[in-house]
């Protein structure tokens, strides 16, 4: 999978590339301990370290880099957004990364003039939806309920909800 992704990045000009820290490290040729689509504990470092890696990757590829994790990093190689929205339970739900990819594609396509900001907004939205879903959880709910609550939060998301965005630039 990594070699196929690396080959695509060499041949195609992507607007954005999203991955967890282990995936981006692997694409940069840095030693990584990937576990399928999950980030390895040994690969996680500080948000500042992730930001530097993301900036290097963006400069190498010309794409906006999105690294998902406890703190999400979005950069064009110059400016860096750190996003603090989200909930730990999100990593226990298969498909949240795919949901974010869909949001990124939609936000980037709709805002080609400000793609970095569009990517940051998509990541904030997904994180806010994760928080809203967590707030709906009852003691007897499991990760399947949580997944459905995330989907509901995306469906019902409004401009007002974006006021819950927690980020720094």
What label would you give each PLM region?
Residues 2, 18-21, 47-51, 98, ...:
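Electropositive phosphate-/nucleotide-binding environments in soluble metabolic enzymes
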Residues 2-80:
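Conserved phosphate/ATP/ADP-binding segment of small-molecule kinases
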Residues 26, 94-124:
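Short, small-residue alpha-helix embedded
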Residues 29-32, 123, 155:
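A generic structural signal for secondary-structure junctions
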Residues 53-58, 115-129, 150-151:
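Short, well-structured alpha-helical segments that form the helix of a local strand-helix-strand
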Residues 64, 90-92, 100:
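Short, flexible coil/turn micro-motifs enriched in small/turn-prone residues
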Residues 81-94:
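Short pre-catalytic strand/loop immediately N-terminal to key active-site residues, enriched for Gly-Thr
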Residues 128-169:
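Charged C-terminal helix
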């Amino acid at each position: 999978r990594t070699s196929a992704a690396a080959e695509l990045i060499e041949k195609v000009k992507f607007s954005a590339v999203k991955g967890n820290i282990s995936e981006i490290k692997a694409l940069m040729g840095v030693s990584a301990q990937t576990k399928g689509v999950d980030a390895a504990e040994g690969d996680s470092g500080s948000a500042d370290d992730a930001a530097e890696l993301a900036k290097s990757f963006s400069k190498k590829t010309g794409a906006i880099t999105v690294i998902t994790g406890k703190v999400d990093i979005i950069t064009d190689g110059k400016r860096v957004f750190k996003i603090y929205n989200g909930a730990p339970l999100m990593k226990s739900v298969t498909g949240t990364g795919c949901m974010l990819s869909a949001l990124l594609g939609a936000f980037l396509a709709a805002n080609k003039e400000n793609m970095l900001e569009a990517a940051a907004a998509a990541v904030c939205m997904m994180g806010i939806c994760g928080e809203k879903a967590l707030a709906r959880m009852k003691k007897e709910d499991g990760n399947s309920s949580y997944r459905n609550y995330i989907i509901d939060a995306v469906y019902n998301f409004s401009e007002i909800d974006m006021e819950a965005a927690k980020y720094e630039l």
